Each structure stands twice: as C-alpha cells, then as structure tokens.
C-alpha cells in the first residue's frame, strides 16, 4: 500500500470519527433537551398558587415549614356567648393581675377561659377538670388557641398547671377522631422523673375516654416499652430512649398530629437539640400541631420554635424578661460556715418537721450525689424517715422514693438537682437548700417546688462564702419578690456577672458594625 493510500485511509477514519462524535453530541443534546422539558413540566405541576404568586414546593422535608392546614387545625373552637358578653375591663383586669402577655400574630384575640363553665368538652373530661376551682392562667389563655388547632409557645414557671394546659386539648382532639390508629399525641420531656409525672397526669384523662397512654424512658428494659408503643395513642418520652427506639424501627411517628416539647429550655441545656430535631423530622409537618412549654425564652429556644412551628401564639405568664421567684414563697437566706451546714440542717428540721408540723412535706436539696448519700445516712442515723432521689440510685429506687413522698409514707425527701425542675409534688410546705445550686436560675426552680397551685410555702437557704459570686443574682431575686435581704449576704457584693457570650466569654461586648474605623495618623 502506497503512502498516499495510507494517508487517504487515515483521513476516512478521522472523518468517520468526527461524524460519529457529532451524532453522539446531537444525541446527548436531544436527550438533555428532553430531560429539561420533562423537568420543566414536572416542576409546573409541583407549583402551588398562593394569591397571585406561584410558590415552588420545597424539596427537603427538613427545611419545610409546617403548613397551617393540619389535621387538628380543622377543629374550630367556638367562644361561648357568656364569655363574649363579659366586659372587656374584666379581661384586662385578669391579664394585669396574672401578668399575662399574648403575642398573637394571627390576630385571633381569643378570650381567656376565666371559668370551666365557658368550656364545652366531653362530659368525662369536663368532670375531671372541674374538680379544680378554676383554670390556671396558662390553661385559661392557651386552651382556646389549642382547641382551635394553633401552635402555641407557653412561657411559664413550673407548677403553673401546664400538663393539663396541653393535655386537655390533646385528649379532646383524639376524641374527635377516634378512627385513627397509631401514635397521635407525643410529649417529649427532658427527664425520666418529669416524663413519669406527665404520664401520671395524662393517664387520668386517657383512662376516662378509653385511650391508651404509655411512658418511655431510659434505665429500664425496652421489651415492655415496645409492646406498649404498639397499642398507645398517647406517648410521653425522653429524647434519648425515643431516638433509640426510632433507630431500631420499633416506633412509628408518622401519625403524630399533636407534638409537645415540655421544658424545652432544659432539654436544650442538656444537649438534646439534635435528638429533638431528628425526632420531629419523623413526624408529618403538614398535619402536626406543635406546642412548646418553657420556663425561659433564650435564643436557642426561639430558633427551635421558628424552625418547627407555624405562626405560634406565644403566651407568657409572669415577668419573663427577668428571673423572678413566686411571690407566695417566703424566702429565708442564712449565711453560714460551710462546715456547720449539716448540723444546721438538723436544727431546721426541728423547726419545720416536728411537733404540729411533723406531717408537713419538706424537700431538701443537696448539690451532688455524694453529698446527698452522706446526708441521707446522717438523717437516718438521727431517726428521720427520709426518701431520696439522686444519681447513685437505680430508676426503680428513685421512683419508689418519689411515690413514698407523694403518698405521705415519708414526708421528708432529699434530692439533687435531677428533681429541681418539673416534678409536681403536691403540698410541699418547705424547701431547704442545704447547698446552694450552681446558678441562681436553678435556685428559683428549686424553691418553685413549694407555693404551687395558689398555696403558700417557705424556702430556707443556707448560703456560704463559697457561693459569693452568686450573691448579686440572689439579692436581685429576693428584692424582686419583696423578700428581706440579710446584711451578711450584701457583704459579698451585689454586682452580677455579665452573661457570657458563647464564643467570646465574658469579654464579649456588642459593637456597632455600622461605624467606620477611625483613621489614625502618626506625626
């Protein structure tokens, strides 16, 4: 074969390759055009009309805000004529007297239920709640919005009756649609003790209407919990155990239409934020009514609410801008030598837990479990029938101790801060702080175990030089509740440490970023 023939053959091969490439390129382009056309058509169908604008449906469920058309939102609360006819001055006076603030972005302006007579529920539920003299402020204000299917944030002190505030509308919604199966009401709570307490309150309602309720928390075997979950419509759970059961496929939350985050601020403090988000994503945002109850309203809680709630109504009871203690509690603060605290405790028990006061409930707080175990032994040695809940005890022992205290079998309970918030122990007359807690916020939550449900109570606190950095905050709380401030406490100073920034510590300060930097010249 000549050189010319070889060259000619090569040219033909190259030409064929070029033609093939052009064909391939054209084929790919046609395929791409076809796909784009198909996608365009698909997107067109996925668009929803909202007024005059077209809004594209989001792709990611985790970023999707819940729609207002939830299953429970279809229920419509009708305000009674008797409540409507009340003069506005009565409503204004009620709001002022109870320091109530409502942020209602939907402008519904629903009136608070000043009496159970203004509420129309199933007779069995009505009979149960009517055992109380009247709704608590959080119940009175929140019920109309919750019965209307709205999302609600409740900011209120512990012991304000919030369990029935979310429990009564939950059971009422369940009764309106009894055909549904699976878990419909989910309450997430930070601790086993609080979860058990909520369960004890809710089961009173579910038993009345023939519904199943179960409580799920760690520290006990899962087998019985798996069985209970399969037949329950109402579930109270701690985040850790619920997530475990979700990950192993033992629980289905797709039917949940009423979600409650109780003590939301405390759950975030304990590091449950990601767990909570993962749990919420297992529910259907389009049919979920979401409730959040919290004692404080920090940035983290606000962000959680904005992510998973739809135009929530915010109901605040009391002054939530600053830390305040229940004014029905007589606060006594005594500055003592740390070495004499346990001897002083025995003196206080003679004052608050002997003679005519022998049967009055007294709650003693220690700071750490080792201290609690030592004090428990000392009290028993001195003849006191004391129950205890702290970290060294098993879940069964803690539950038994709490039940003994509630029933009156033991009227003296020793606890660490595991029980400082949320535990609803009725008729606690006196709280003794043997060791001051790590924060003034915890102090307020501790003493909030007494003076509940309109009753009065006493909180006696032993304060030492070791806690002097907290003196200023404690003085503010005492002044805010019109309580006497001991001279020995003022000697420690009344300044309060600035709240630390998460990244910059106590050196953080707000800077006006709009100001331009000054030009500095050197001569």
From Swiss-Prot:
**Residues reported to bind ATP:** 156-163
The answer to whether the entry has keyword Disulfide bond is no
- Provenance organism: Saccharomyces cerevisiae (strain ATCC 204508 / S288c) (Baker's yeast)
Lineage of source species:
Eukaryota, Fungi, Dikarya, Ascomycota, Saccharomycotina
Q: Which reaction does it catalyse?
A: ATP + H2O = ADP + phosphate + H(+)
**SUPFAM superfamilies, A to Z:** P-loop containing nucleoside triphosphate hydrolases
The miscellaneous comment for this protein is: Present with 38900 molecules/cell in log phase SD medium.
Q: Where is the composition biased (Basic residues)?
A: 22-48
Please state every residue range assigned to the domain named Helicase ATP-binding.
143-315
**Domain statement:** The Q motif is unique to and characteristic of the DEAD box family of RNA helicases and controls ATP binding and hydrolysis.
Q: What is this protein called?
A: ATP-dependent RNA helicase DBP3
The source's domain of life comes to Eukaryota
Q: Where in the cell is it found?
A: Nucleus, Nucleolus
Broadest EC class? hydrolase
Sequence similarity: Belongs to the DEAD box helicase family. DDX5/DBP2 subfamily.
